[in-house]
Amino acid sequence: MPSVIENDNNILTVKISGDIDHHASKELRLEIDREIMHARPKQVIFDLTECEFMDSSGLGLILGRMRKSSECGCDFKLVNPGAKTMRILRMAGVEKLIKIESVDL
């Protein structure tokens, strides 16, 4: 799961490409947490435009970063999930907990 983490104008954007699974979740989780704690952004955005697959580890990654963001006082949202990813998010009830948008970044 290649990913890019950008901090621009106090907005931390995590761009996920490929799969969010147990193989890559731990390393990415640590990297994102470090950035949230260091930068203290006003908003964290997970850009799922290029996310092709997500398992329960991916859901855990997202929900954990939502909680970490909340603890630091910053907003959290997901943008541009594809149909397969959105189906998993809906099945897990994530759309009731996290703002999900379709936008052009």
Regions found by a protein language model. Give the residues of each.
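STAS-like cytosolic regulatory interaction modules
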Residues: 1-52, 67-105
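ABC-family nucleotide-binding domains
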Residues: 55
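Aromatic/hydrophobic pocket-lining residues that form π-stacking "cages" and hydrophobic walls in ligand
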Residues: 62-65
